[in-house]
Amino acid sequence: MSKLIIAEKPSVAKSIASALGASSRADGFYEGSGLLISWCVGHLVSPMDAGGYDERFKKWRYDDLPILPEPFRYVLAPGKENAFENLRALMDRPDVDTIVNACDAGREGELIFRLVYEMAECRKPVLRLWISSMEDSAIREGFSDLRPGADYEALYQSALCRQKADWLVGINATRLFSVLYHRTLNVGRVQTPTLAMLAERDAKITLFHKEKYHLLRLTLDGAEAVSEKFTDPAEAEQAAAMCKGAAVTCTSVTKEQKKEQPPKLYDLTTLQREANRLFGYTAKQTLDYAQSLYEKKLLTYPRTDSRYLTSDMAETVSCVIHLAAKLPPFDGCTNFFPLVEAMISDKDVSDHHAIIPTMEIEKADIKALPLGERNLFLLVCCKLLCASAEPYMYEAVTATFDCGDHSFTAKGKRILAEGWREIDRIFRIFLKEKPVDGDGGTLPDFTEGQTFDGAEVSVTEHFTQPPKPYTEDTLLSAMENAGKDDIPDEAERKGLGTPATRAAIIEKLVAAGFVERNGKSLIPTKAGINLVTILPEPLTSPMLTAEWEQKLTEIAKGGADPDTFMDGILMMVQEIVSTYSCISEDGKKLFAPEKEVIGTCPRCGQPVYEGKKNFACSDRSCGFVLWKNDRFWTSRKKELTKKMATDLLKKGRTNVKGIWSEKKQATYDAAVILDDTGGKYINFKLEFPKRKVGADGRK
């Protein structure tokens, strides 16, 4: 008898087949060693669209809302019928007695497999392959420790709840507000509160009022001491005058030894954030690069929310660290003795451990990788080396001075042990990036009571700074914390989406026209801001959405009831539909298309706008309209263009070439003159160019 192994994509199936000795390639699967290995192509099975439940749902109408399928039905994804039929045929083979789910080890991978298994109506036993690396050794080890598929029932229920909740909120809210505002408005359970955070930040920037302030700067032995802020420039100048040339006394010197522990390893979100800061990569680009490196067996599983390793990995990671330390530019690090203990925490690893390089690093040609993958791979290597290095230790020095009855402060530091920052500095220099040294350079050796004569003082002007627009780096952080700042590293986070879905959420907002990229910044568009303005709090609140996400996590762990979760989603959808049945006239204008003014109405002086069929005065009571296909134009095989209409409104005439004469069966050129008598229809006259007089006096 044979086991059928189903992977999520062809490249993964190929790696599994190679590792397990299934070397014979057939049509749609590999075979060998008592195994059949095939693959999905992402989601083969999807929830049925609303129109599939009832013909009337194919049209978007308020009266049909809310649409609440019971039970949910599923269909094959368009274009993937052959892939599904191949899997169903393999499942039905009489020599197959067991199915192995080898889709990605996470919520979405579980859903991809289960929906195919259910639609194929397969009832054969299921085992689960759960691995965090595509290395041959990891695949073989995982296959020797297959777990019962039933162990992942809670994870499957969590995935189903996520999918159903997204469908219910997306279908009903999108149809509701699109019908009300006469424009397609895509509303999503997670993307809309993310948009709300962007809109809130944009509003803070718009409303920000900058304020001027001044600082006094005192120069002492090459060091600079700074005063408190002065909001009154005259007061600052007066203080500077008192200090210039006056004696300066050092009133205190404090020295404090400080220690910065090595950074933690990467989870997906922190990797995406740092890749955005250093390389400008979008969250999706980083995920794509990391996924490719995972499939090339160079990185461990990327869709993780853990920044720690498990205790059984200590020996392996120690070997990987020594291999990474041999790679340029890290081979220039000195006195490096890896400390693995700080990276180990079994309680902080649930499904997958932190992202690290694999043992394949020894055989890989890193220089041959595409630039994006190479940068990301070296970034992960750098983090692994930093995380296993000694702490960074320094002495923080603060010196205060008195001059002309004003206090000044100078800050500096003296490095005691560079520790992990040496590795970080070498990597940043390699990238031609400025090393992160923190505040303050080395101060002279000031002593309390020390005096200086003839103070040099300058006044500098400054302005308070507005909040900065979100970048993918800072937005990912906000999504992870549901917009709440100052959350301790060890606190339980209730975020928007998951590490695996946040990149797609950002891309959806951009694709829908609600967000634009401006360099590294993410800026909400007018349509995006208006959408957030009209939607109710349950759809825009980051904290409420994060609570839903937390409940999904609890369901996956077996700690919450799926039915209770779905009841809450259904209640929210029903309440939103019943609350919003009509909108004001002002509300309808929010999403009215912006019209270009092409001229001024000759009758009333109001703006004239272009419509689909005409150019009309914005004051409907005026009645002035230029029709694009007026009989005057169609009889002459012409259409009134925007340029022609602009000329008519500005100059009262427009020159037209190629006018058709039905009588002469030929074309001619002429000027068309606007002849408005104030009636319902506009009249036009033709004016022909005068012929030039020849030398003999003839025309």
Segments (PLM) and residue ranges:
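Flexible glycine-/small-residue-rich
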Residues: A7-E8, W39-V41, C103, V169, ...
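Amphipathic alpha-helical transducer elements in NTP-driven molecular machines
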Residues: P10-A17, G34-V41, A77-R88, R93, ...
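Basic, low-complexity terminal or inter-domain segments flanking catalytic cores
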Residues: S2-L4, K80, M91, D97, ...
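Intrinsically disordered, low-complexity regulatory segments
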Residues: M1-Q163, P338, P466
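C-terminal or mid-to-C-terminal helical accessory/interaction module adjacent to the motor/catalytic core
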Residues: F72, P94, D136-L220, K255-K259
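Conserved short loop/turn motifs at secondary-structure junctions
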Residues: M1-S2, A102-A105, H182-T184, K255-K264, ...
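Metal- or metallocofactor-binding catalytic centers and their adjacent structured scaffolds
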Residues: P233-Y266, Q272
